[in-house]
Amino acid sequence: MKYMTVTDLNNAGATVIGTIKGGEWFLGTPHKDILSKPGFYFLVSKLDGRPFSNPCVSARFYVGNQRSKQGFSAVLSHIRQRRSQLARTIANNNMVYTVFYLPASKMKPLTTGFGKGQLALAFTRNHHSEYQTLEEMNRMLADNFKFVLQAY
């Protein structure tokens, strides 16, 4: 099993939405419409632009449809409140993390299509069904990749 990298995220079509430090937005806050989207949010440390730098993904979070439309802002609130060991680590380690967003509709290369070539990926069943949850996709990510700050 390998660590997920920025290259994996870019190949799946993830977009950078901002940077955080200690559970707070660093260098500007993205618009609420961006933060309330359901999908997966990945934290990457040390995204410094060096030509051969391919940093590993530190952590992943998923956000479903919410009536309150808090989205990733709720995750940041949990980090600031230090509600888990992961949240305490992110809040206290004084590192800047780049936040990548990937909607569930683009998860196929990282879940059921992981490790397959372009042709095989085209014929791989789509992982998304009305009965499949973001939790199941999260477990598939854990089956395919390791994350620096998360054991599962």
Swiss-Prot record:
Kindly give the InterPro entries that the UniProt entry links to this protein.
Phage_Ndd
Q: Which GO terms describe its biological process?
A: symbiont-mediated perturbation of host cell cycle progression; symbiont-mediated suppression of host DNA replication
**Record keywords:** DNA-binding, Host-virus interaction, Inhibition of host DNA replication by virus, Modulation of host cell cycle by virus
Segments crossing the lipid bilayer: none
Q: Which GO terms describe its molecular function?
A: DNA binding
Q: Does the keyword DNA-binding apply?
A: yes
- Per the record, the domain of life is Viruses
Record has Kinase as a keyword: no
A Pfam family reported for this protein in Swiss-Prot or TrEMBL:
Phage_T4_Ndd
Job description of the protein:
Disorganizes the host nucleoid and inhibits replication, but without host DNA cleavage or degradation. Only the architecture of the nucleoid is affected. May act on the host chromosomal sequences that determine the structure of the nucleoid. Binds to dsDNA but not to ssDNA.
Under which name does UniProt file this protein?
Nucleoid disruption protein
> What is the species listed in this Swiss-Prot or TrEMBL entry?
Escherichia phage RB69
**Lineage of origin:** Viruses, Duplodnaviria, Heunggongvirae, Uroviricota, Caudoviricetes
Gene name in the database record: ndd
